[in-house]
Amino acid sequence: MQISNVQLDQPYSSLDIYHSASDVALPAVVIVPGGSYQQIKERDSERVAITFTTHAFQAFVVRYPVLEHRDYQAAKTAVAQAFDYIVDHATELDVNPDQLGVIGFSAGGQLAAAYSNQTATKAKFVALGYPVIKPTIDDRMGVKTEDVSQLVTDQTPATFIWGSVNDGLTPYLDHVNAYTMMLAQHGVPFELHEFGTGNHGIALANKYTGIVNRDRVDRHMSRWFPLFLEWFAEVIE
């Protein structure tokens, strides 16, 4: 595997590339980490990307503007530019554009959902982990966002969502439930896994991504990843 980074046109934004040479074009996932627009959560980034590459995916991580440069619209632009770059370089990156999707965690889930609902989206599938859906925590994050559930249409790509019912940062009723209701109303295929308990910001929920914060290791919630792979094989491949 070769790891590289390219700068995007959006200032303070770049794309980490985890490319595995392949004789055939592979599925690919664009990872949009969380971090409340204050940081790029490393727990959601390289270790998630490397895990995807071990399952025959090409993987990418979008680094969008954060801290004093944080801006919701700029972050959305960075995600769109990342997809444009990958599709434009699909041959050399061994990517199958028909199996290219986005996965977002927390605030990154908000960005992933927003991008997937653009009319020009290049995402063929979406995965959202404990996503921010409504602008209920804008003050905490220091940005002005939007209610991405209102962006859903019948053209929204098939979506996989997971989180925990007792998530105190993105409460189920305000966020995941609001989004899945709109998916159902528009006839968008989706699969939802809301675990009974579990922390926010849990990434893969295993010891690999929870190496620093052991409270982010949860054997039960870690089931989301094999469930996603099963869903992908049935719905997308």
Task: Describe each region flagged by the PLM.
Residues 186-237:
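C-terminal catalytic histidine-bearing segment of alpha/beta-hydrolase fold enzymes
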Residues 25-34:
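Short beta-strand element of the alpha/beta-hydrolase
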Residues 81-148, 154:
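Primarily recognizes the serine-hydrolase "nucleophile elbow" in alpha/beta-hydrolase
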Residues 42-60:
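Short amphipathic alpha-helix adjacent to the substrate-entry channel of hydrolases
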Residues 41, 63-97:
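Catalytic nucleophile-loop/oxyanion-hole region of alpha/beta-hydrolase
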Residues 39-47, 172-175:
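The serine-hydrolase catalytic nucleophile loop
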Residues 1-24:
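N-terminal cap/lid segment of alpha/beta-hydrolase-fold proteins
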Residues 125, 131-186, 191:
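The feature captures the conserved acid-bearing segment of alpha/beta-hydrolase catalytic domains
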